[in-house]
Amino acid sequence: MVEESELKYFVRIINTDLDGTQPVQLALTGIKGIGLHAALIIARRAGVDTRATMGLLGDEDVAAIEEQVKAYPASVPKWMVNRPVDVYSGEPKHLYGSDLSLAKEDDINLMKKMRCYRGIRHENGLKVRGQRTKATGRFGKIVGVSKRRN
């Protein structure tokens, strides 16, 4: 059994504090932009057991994981990154954390500025991806049917 003093409760990778009590694959999903599949690929390429507890890894293993996170976009096919075609550069990119949030916000603002269909739907707070809006997605005061009193 491992002593509690050896367990690091927080492991810092790519400006994100990860839960040290979780397995490596699950802990890596705490970084915005990394899902379960990407975490599995990163852990395997770093040579770390995916089921090992994150807080019990040595510094060299954490450094290897961080290197693989940085090298992830170059080591996977174009369709596996979260921005296969960047709007401005045209190159495939994989963004993490606040960079991903800012890029998504910039994309929405660009659509609003272009006044394309999706941009107009975003402006009006309506559903964007073709869902039906007659019965679901309503907002405002709820008015139900009331029973008549005798």
Curated annotation (Swiss-Prot):
Molecular function in Gene Ontology: rRNA binding; structural constituent of ribosome
Organism superkingdom: Archaea
UniProt KW keywords: Ribonucleoprotein, Ribosomal protein, RNA-binding, rRNA-binding
GO biological process, one term: translation
GO cellular component: cytosol; small ribosomal subunit
Family statement drawn from the similarity comment of this UniProt entry: Belongs to the universal ribosomal protein uS13 family.
Subunit annotation: Part of the 30S ribosomal subunit. Forms a loose heterodimer with protein S19. Forms two bridges to the 50S subunit in the 70S ribosome.
Function statement: Located at the top of the head of the 30S subunit, it contacts several helices of the 16S rRNA. In the 70S ribosome it contacts the 23S rRNA (bridge B1a) and protein L5 of the 50S subunit (bridge B1b), connecting the 2 subunits; these bridges are implicated in subunit movement.
Protein name: Small ribosomal subunit protein uS13
Native species: Methanocorpusculum labreanum (strain ATCC 43576 / DSM 4855 / Z)
Highest classification ranks of the organism: Archaea, Methanobacteriati, Methanobacteriota, Stenosarchaea group, Methanomicrobia
Originating gene: rps13
